[in-house]
Amino acid sequence: MSNHDQLHRYLFANHAVRGELVSVNETYQQVLANHDYPPAVQKLLGEMLVATSLLTATLKFDGDITVQLQGGDGPLTLAVINGNNRQEMRGVARVKGEISDDSTLQEMVGNGYLVITITPAQGERYQGVVALEGETIAACLENYFMQSEQLPTRLFIRTGHVADKAAAGGMLLQVLPAQERNEDEFDHLAQLTATIKAEELFTLPANEVLYRLYHQEEVTLYEPQNVSFRCTCSRQRCADALVTLADDDVTEMLEQDGNIDMHCEYCGNHYLFDAVDIATLKNGNSASSEQIH
């Protein structure tokens, strides 16, 4: 599509169907950086990243979406992607045990489930739980849309490599709400979209991708939105967490290592706190408490 990760929205003039097209090559590479995930887990995270970007683009408000696989008895105990309406993404996975290169979703997760959490900047949080009945993340999320919004939705996700670097992209088709539905038209557009090749998604401009798929259709392509990796960790957040720990626990950690090393699983950053830092934090927290009371 382009040298930078972007999400494009598009609309069919003669059908009550809208679409999205996204490429997340660079963001995907940053999610995988500093981690030694098995190839099957890398692929799964790429699929989840694409899906989260496409889902986030459906938000009509400022807020966050988290797509999380909670493992059951499989070796993949957790896989999660966080995104927001600004298309800022991050993700991480946890693995305990061996995962072969050709492991399926069910083999990795076991009797787990998919959790979609939508958190508006203002308003109540919504959470949907989907059983892993589909063979892919895309199939599971299509079930989610039918359960939660009753809107026929199809996702087409591709992962792979370009010049030996991880690449991922995808497309979403969805029937417009409050419109008269024509299942045959939607199925026809879905069949066309399913022919998209991975290398086309990874490398071609959006307008060329849409022309190759829908050259007999009238399609409006809207201005793109940039997609990026962004971690929300900070030294202050770590400090806020430390002051909630019991003094004995903090003292024990300091005695063992001489400092407390707080490591962010998402981006790999380390935040070190020594005894002087801890004392300053505790004193500051105590002073704040005195002011409150």
From Swiss-Prot:
One of its GO terms (cellular component) is cytoplasm. It is found in: Cytoplasm. InterPro entries: Heat_shock_Hsp33 (IPR000397), Heat_shock_Hsp33_C (IPR016154), Heat_shock_Hsp33_N (IPR016153), Hsp33_helix_hairpin_bin_dom_sf (IPR023212). One of its GO terms (biological process) is protein refolding. The keyword Ion transport does not apply. Keywords: Chaperone, Cytoplasm, Disulfide bond, Redox-active center, Zinc. Under oxidizing conditions two disulfide bonds are formed involving the reactive cysteines. Under reducing conditions zinc is bound to the reactive cysteines and the protein is inactive. One of its GO terms (molecular function) is protein folding chaperone. Disulfide bonds join C231-C233, C264-C267. Signal peptide: none annotated. It holds the Pfam family HSP33. Belongs to the HSP33 family. Redox regulated molecular chaperone. Protects both thermally unfolding and oxidatively damaged proteins from irreversible aggregation. Plays an important role in the bacterial defense system toward oxidative stress. This is 33 kDa chaperonin. It comes from Yersinia pestis.
